[in-house]
Amino acid sequence: SAENQRSALKRIRFMAENLAPGEYYLPLTVAEEAGTEEHQTINYLISIRARQLGEYKLNADQVFAVFYLDTEKYQPLLVDEYLMSKLDANTWENAWSEREDGLRTIGNIVNLNKVVLDYDAETGRALLNLGNDMRYVLDHIDKYIRPLQDKGRKVCICLEGGGTGLGFCNLTDAQIVDFVAQVKTVITEYALDGVNFWDRNAAYGKEGMPAMNTTSYPKLIKAMREALGNDKLVTLTDYEAPTEYFWDTGATGGIEVGQYLDYAWSGYLDNEKNVQIVDPWHQGQQYVSTDHPRKPIAGLDPAKYGCI
């Protein structure tokens, strides 16, 4: 039968390195087994796109900025519309001479949200839910994502809770392994640059759901780093109870969470108040917010923490 003739799933990835933009014809021949004459040729038409650098150069060195972009409301290329200029302190002339107006765009990391952790009550699985809008953006990635990456930005997905009562802080070991595998598939398939963890909207405490614990989230971060490797970004938004114990390796099961992170930053923002500077390493200083006292994340270089 046709079913019996199917091989195991094979993944083939074409790399466009050193190829000029254009269309290429690739005949791929698959043999049933070595030494047989039976084979099948599959013809691929592959389009290689030209890099799109846009109108403005990215100012990536002097200002480290992270964008969160809600794909339900905005398209990712909006990031390129945020501009800044720099003046020479001595002459008051444009310090960036590649344009007459001296403008550059900003944004080292673009986190696309939201991608949520859902719960399947029938199977007990923690499921990655991209949502229709995010999936549309990813399915049109050459239009919405690649131009941002061409300029040097890192484009990641922001992982959040899905309001089911299951979140990063109450996963079983089996759920962690399963969920990480799902995330890795998306990152690999779409050639994204990593993930951002922001544990909010999980709705912990729902009837029938496990209580929060202090080891699940650190295990998840560690497993994600090990799955994605060091070539992808793993970042953390430091926000409220889910991350408040990350300073204490006794609570985290011996895991120094910061060892598995590229960056972390404060998630506290209130548009009705002045800018809140959250600096766990200088708590008590006059400039540091007293509304949101935090402790240093174990193993994290202070230079890798965004205070605003």
Predicted regions and their residues:
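Substrate-binding surface in catalytic domains of secreted glycosidases
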Residues: 129-130, 198-308
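Glycan-recognition patch characteristic of GH18 chitinases/ENGases
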Residues: 51-174, 271-294
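Structural recognition of the beta-strand scaffold that forms the well-ordered cores
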Residues: 64-69, 108-116, 154-160, 193-199, ...
